[in-house]
Amino acid sequence: MERFVILLALAGLSYLLLHAEGLVKTSRARFAVLGALFAAFGLRLILFGVAPNDTANAVESAIAWYRDAGGFWGIRSSALPFSIPVQYFMALFSLAPDGGLTLFKYLCVFSEVTMAWAAQRCVQCVTVRAQPRLFAFLIVLLLPSGIFQGVCSAAGDSLWWAFIALAASCAMRGEWRWCAGMLALAVAFHPAALWIVPVFWVFTAVRRNTWFSLLHLVGWYVAVMVPALLLGRPGSECLPFYPSLAALTARPLFDGAPGIYSLSQYSIIAPTGIAIYVVFALLLVWRMSRKSLAADRRRQLTALSLASLCAVAFLPWMCADSLYGAEVLLVALCCLEPKLTPAVVCASFASALALLKDIYGSAVFLPIGWASLALLAAMIVLLLYLVFRKRTVKQAG
């Protein structure tokens, strides 16, 4: 009964957000929204706790560890591999007598609602039409990967990707201080977000570039870490941390993640993958820095979506859950450009297959290589769209 009430409250929150945006004014829209919300949260209720994997077990063990360590006082220890903001929530949930994992799953579902709202905000920056904005919100809530990574595996990747999506919507609106704050929170929740931050330069080419916003990024990050410092956490452990390349090449990587690393058992190609992503991101930002190209907000969102897909494909720190955030950005883009539907389908297939392999293992007969090929196909579609739209702009001029 508790799960039903909480999920019903989150569904009500989703409806209130749509109502506040003025997207449910007609009876037809209300009927469609209620049906989609019933399907989205009904599936979450049915699949809640089904086939927990190693990620869910790790979260449950971490919450139990905090319960034994005295709640928030356990933050001073570096025994757990989770980021500090995530440990804040684990320490908070450990104060409950039981059901800490269930509370963490509710947090994941709340972040998915936030991502749906951020997706419709990105669409709103291009068009005020209600239909594409409504589609963006509802499709994000109905994505299979979002349901799997939230209520099944309790993966926290939706937490930091929610801030990336919010940062994108703020950047498209020119709200640089809020954008910097959202990026800081994303980096605090997962250091992998630091690789996405430079790509946001594609939003600044035709607007006043406020370097002062970087101070906001640092300030927000420090503010998030202050409670951990006050509780006795060493300052060196509050910085974004990555394993060394030597450590990466000495152990297997996430074999359940789509990308180049699913094609090799060991991470001997880790330096190559990192170099490919860095070069690609620099070329993308350099190309989009031209005012004639960067004035198109659709292309800005395309560039960010493409960079997010490349991050999952080439960076060795990404896992099967990381593709969900890029998938959400693609949904927002597809609602603006329906011709990009094949890219969304490929990315959704890759994300769902990777998550199913992560949850059910060998019970899923398709190899993870199919997810890697689908991810590559989505990247190719986005590249072709960038080239095609460039030619269209030239012909129109």
Predicted features along the sequence, with ranges:
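Loop-to-helix entry region of an early transmembrane alpha helix in multi-pass inner-membrane enzymes
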Residues: 80, 84, 98-117, 150, ...
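Specific aromatic-rich, kink-prone transmembrane helix
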Residues: 118-121, 159-178, 329-333
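Transmembrane signal-anchor helices characteristic of membrane glycosylation enzymes that use polyprenol
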Residues: 2-6, 11-57, 219-233, 309
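Perimembrane helix-loop-helix junctions
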Residues: 13, 173, 195-219
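Short acidic/glycine- and proline-prone juxtamembrane loop motifs at membrane-interface regions
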Residues: 151-157, 319
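Membrane-interface alpha helices of multi-pass inner-membrane proteins
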Residues: 164-170, 177-193, 197-200, 307-314
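Aromatic/glycine/proline-enriched transmembrane-helix motif characteristic
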Residues: 17-24, 28, 116, 125, ...
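Extracytoplasmic catalytic/substrate-binding loops of multi-pass membrane glycan-assembly enzymes
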Residues: 49-62, 77-89
